Structures are given as structure tokens and as C-alpha cells.
Regions:
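N-terminal basic, amphipathic alpha-helical segments
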Residues: 1-142, 336, 342, 346-353, ...
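Active-site PLP attachment segment
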Residues: 75, 305-340, 355
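Short glycine-rich anion-binding loops that position phosphate/pyrophosphate groups of nucleotides
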Residues: 124, 255-259, 320, 455
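Conserved core of the PLP fold type I
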Residues: 138-143, 148-281, 292-293, 298-309, ...
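Helix-loop "lid/cap" segments that line or gate small-molecule binding pockets
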Residues: 167, 330, 358-365
């Protein structure tokens, strides 16, 4: 059974919740996230997950049944209609172009404030962050720049020059990224960068090759641009390159630490992707997720550092390394796209908070950033080892592939297990452990994605003890 990929309902909207739910499911079907024959969650599960009445869910499903998008099967559930035929050249079959109609909020998960629930993926431990040092950097930035940081800064659409220079130096030293500082554009996290790139590079019906399973929010950003997502298989060497005859406009990959499987893209695959992009005039978006968090051998070179044709766009964020509410990321934009990219960003925001940018520039320049990364790498490596040891001792029915870094571990369940059911059971017990199928377009082996980095050893031990009691039931 497929999930609804974290459908989000806007309670401040004038559109009814029933209408939003029906429209959201319809768009998931039209975009290919839900395929003909896929089973949908029950109306009870939808109502519980989205905090709406069951009548709202029932009425939305009934409407989609009447429109031919869904079909109920007696005693089995509700399925995407097997008779639906979608045009291969269109993702959103609306009467108007996507740019001419208001965009519905993408179906993203809204997380509660506060400490993360046990095993929530991709969460740093904020208790390790040197808050006193950060506050000194903020104070120093205000002392140096004065009230100028409190005003609009017209030339700073691409980011504070001091921060862009320090980010460029950091990327050159740590990842071999080849760029001038003016190619570094500061964004409010990697997601804004992906959304801007999708808007700039993709048109209706263009094909985007993405990892499957992979990062859902990236896929949604591409689909909202009108592009057609082509799922690419992931194996022990990472993303399989597109076939020689395949034509795609853009390839999206997380090569350092593929999300959610945790594998690294092999050097041969990196070179094959670059060769494909050069031969076909395609773009590669390299989301260098988790590249700093490697606990064994040093990371392989970034794709951008291997590219000689300027077809790789490098994307990153500081929120995973420092703290999640720091909404500062970056895109290293090829010269040929720079003016258009900055112009598009200007339509979204004049600039991001300048005090935080100035503080981060000083944090990088002072060396405090690198000290923090070393501290995190040591703590997270110990936690990964402890987590795996506790899991082995508990004899869980989960298979964990070898991992030498990252913030998460993906445990594979027996082939006949329903990982969505297990994820819901764990959620009911207070855990946040997404199903591997949540990140997949096509059927995949069932699994569960565990985050471990945000939790100190005593918390991990207690959480694994609770987890053991929940999983005592036979899988």
C-alpha cells in the first residue's frame, strides 16, 4: 500500500479541506507518484494522519471515485483506477499552464517544534553546537557592521559577499569544488535551491532522472515545474546512470550519501553520469548531502570537481551540520546560468537574514566551523557504532547494510513485510521511523529509516529498549 507522501493541508486557505485532499491525491496520480493499481491508505488512516474528520476523507475519496481516478474493491480497499491513461508529455493536465494558476502547497510534512522523536532521520544533535561561540560571532558581526546589517541590502540578493567567499574556500578545500566566490549563491536551505533550479531549467513535459528511492521533496519540486520524473534504480554503487538512448534534461543525485539508502556513488558511476550529461546536454544537480559525515575512508571527489563541461550544479546546506533552524544553504551556479538564477531568486526574496549570514561567515573564517564538524564526526561515529551494536544484541528482524558515515541507517525488512504498517506501529509508540517505501516511486524492498545522530548514548539505549518491546511481534 502506498502512502500519500505527507500530503499537507492548509487550514488558513479558503479552499475546503475536502477539496484540498481530493486535489492533492489527484496531483499525486497525475504526476506518477501514485500509479494505476496502487492501493491508497484507508480513510481512517488518512483522517488520523492529516487531522481531519473521517467524513472529509470519505467525501474526498468518493469524489475521486466519481471522477474515475479511484476505484473501490470490495473487502480490499481503494485503488488508483487501472483504466487511467495519462499523457506521456504532460504532468499536470490542467486547462491552464502551471505558471498561470496559483500553486497549491506541496505535500510536505509539518514537524512539531521541540526535540525530535526517537530515530527521526537527518537530525543533528544541537546540544553539540557551540552556542556561546555562535553568539559571540553574532555580536562581533553587529559590532563590525553596525546597523547596516539591519537594513535592506540591494546588492545581497546572492548573499553577503563575505559569506560567499568563505563558502567558496570551504568547498574548494573540503570537496574540491572549482568555482569563483561570485558563483556561490546563498539560499534558505537546499530546498529553495532545488525549487529555483527546477523553475529555471525545466519546462512542462521535460524529463528528470531521479534516484528511486530518493529525496521526496526534490521530486516534488521537479514535478511542480511541470517536469516528468523518471525514477532511476539505486544499487550498492548508487544511482544507475540513464540508459544510453534515454533523453533526460536533468539528473538529480545525492552521491556522497544517497538518501535514504546511505550508499555512496562509485567513481565509475560518477564518471558515467558526467559523460552522459556532456553527450546529451543534460544538467546534473549534485546535492552533496552528508558529505562531511564520513567515519572511515575520505569521501570520493565531488561530481562538480570531476566535471570539465560546466554541466554540474552543486547544492548544499548548513542546517544538517549546524542546527536545523539555520535556514542557510548554497548553490554553486555555472557561469552560464548565474545571471538568470540570481534574477529568479530576486523574485522570491531580496536577501536572507544578514546577521546570520555575517555570523556564519565569521564562524567559518575563525575555524570554529571546522572544530564543530570534527566534534560531530567523532560523536556521530560513536553513536552509529553503539546503535548497530544494540540492534545486533536485540536480534531485530532487520538487515542493515554496511555504512561508514551519515546521519541515518536503513534497516531492510523481510520481503513480505509491509513497512508502512510497521512505520505506523512505531509512530503510535512515539517513534519517528519512516518506511523506505515512502521515498520510492516503484515497489522496493520494505525497510525502515532510522536516524541516530541527534540522540546521546543514554537516549539511544533507552530508545532501542522501547523499540525492542514494540518489535517483539513477529514481522
Amino acid at each position: 500500500m502506498r502512502t500519500l507522501a505527507g500530503l499537507w493541508l492548509d487550514r488558513a486557505s479558503r479552499t475546503t479541506l475536502q477539496e484540498q485532499l481530493a486535489r492533492g491525491v489527484k496531483e499525486l496520480i497525475q504526476s506518477g507518484v501514485l500509479a494505476p493499481g496502487d492501493e491508497l491508505p484507508s480513510t481512517r488512516d488518512v483522517a488520523t494522519g492529516l487531522h481531519v474528520s473521517r467524513n472529509t476523507a470519505v467525501n474526498a475519496y468518493d469524489r475521486l471515485v466519481s471522477e474515475g481516478f479511484l476505484e473501490p474493491v470490495s473487502r480490499s480497499g481503494v485503488f488508483v483506477s487501472s483504466s487511467i491513461t495519462l499523457s506521456p508529455h504532460s504532468t499536470w493536465p490542467a486547462p491552464r499552464a502551471p505558471r498561470a494558476r496559483p500553486a497549491a502547497p506541496p505535500p510536505l510534512v509539518r514537524e512539531p517544534l521541540g526535540s525530535p522523536a526517537p530515530f527521526r532521520p537527518s537530525q543533528p544533535d544541537v546540544s553539540l553546537f557551540p552556542l556561546l561561540v555562535w553568539n559571540r560571532m553574532r555580536s562581533r558581526a553587529l559590532k563590525i557592521e553596525g546597523r547596516s546589517l539591519l537594513h535592506y541590502q540591494a546588492p545581497c540578493v546572492a548573499g553577503l559577499p563575505a559569506l560567499r567567499q568563505n563558502v567558496a574556500a570551504y568547498l574548494r578545500d573540503s570537496r574540491g569544488v572549482r568555482c569563483d566566490w561570485h558563483q556561490v549563491v546563498i539560499t534558505s536551505g537546499s530546498q529553495q535551491g532545488l525549487f529555483l533550479l527546477a523553475s529555471l531549467l525545466l519546462g512542462r513535459g521535460e524529463r528528470v532522472y531521479v534516484e528511486d528511492p530518493g529525496y521526496v521533496e526534490a521530486r516534488l519540486a521537479f514535478q511542480r515545474s511541470g517536469a516528468r520524473v523518471v525514477p532511476g534504480p539505486v544499487d550498492e554503487q548508487g544511482l544507475c546512470p540513464p540508459a544510453r538512448g534515454a533523453k533526460v534534461s536533468l539528473v538529480y543525485t545525492t552521491p556522497s550519501r544517497q538518501f535514504p539508502t546511505g550508499v555512496s556513488l562509485s567513481l565509475a558511476r560518477r564518471l558515467a553520469l558526467i559523460d552522459y550529461a556532456g553527450r546529451n546536454g543534460a544538467w546534473i544537480v549534485e546535492d552533496d548531502y552528508d558529505s562531511e559525515l564520513r567515519y572511515g575512508a575520505p569521501p570520493l571527489p565531488s561530481l562538480q570537481s570531476l566535471d570539465g563541461s560546466g554541466r554540474v550544479i552543486y547544492v548544499g546546506t548548513f542546517s544538517k551540520l549546524l542546527f536545523p533552524s539555520l535556514r542557510l544553504g548554497y548553490v554553486v551556479v555555472p557561469e552560464s546560468l548565474l545571471e538568470s538564477f540570481v534574477g529568479l531568486k530576486h523574485l522570491m526574496d531580496d536577501h536572507l537574514p544578514l546577521v546570520d549570514q555575517a555570523a556564519l561567515a565569521l564562524f567559518l573564517e575563525s575555524g570554529a566551523f571546522y572544530s564543530h564538524i570534527r566534534r560531530c564526526r567523532k560523536a556521530y561515529a560513536e553513536r552509529q557504532g553503539l546503535f548497530l551494536k544494540l540492534l545486533r544484541e536485540a536480534d531485530f528482524p532487520l538487515e542493515f547494510p554496511v555504512a561508514d558515515g551519515g546521519m541515518n541507517l536503513t534497516g531492510l525488512l523481510p520481503a513480505k513485510a509491509d513497512d508502512a504498517v510497521w512505520s505506523r506501529r512505531l509512530a503510535a509508540a512515539g517513534f519517528d521511523v519512516p518506511a523506505l517505501s515512502r521515498y520510492a516511486v516503484r515497489p522496493t524492498r520494505p525497510g525502515l529509516v532510522f536516524g541516530f545522530t541527534a540522540f546521546a548514548p543514554p537516549v539511544l539505549r533507552a530508545a532501542v529498549g522501547r523499540l525492542r518491546r514494540v518489535l517483539e511481534t513477529r514481522v
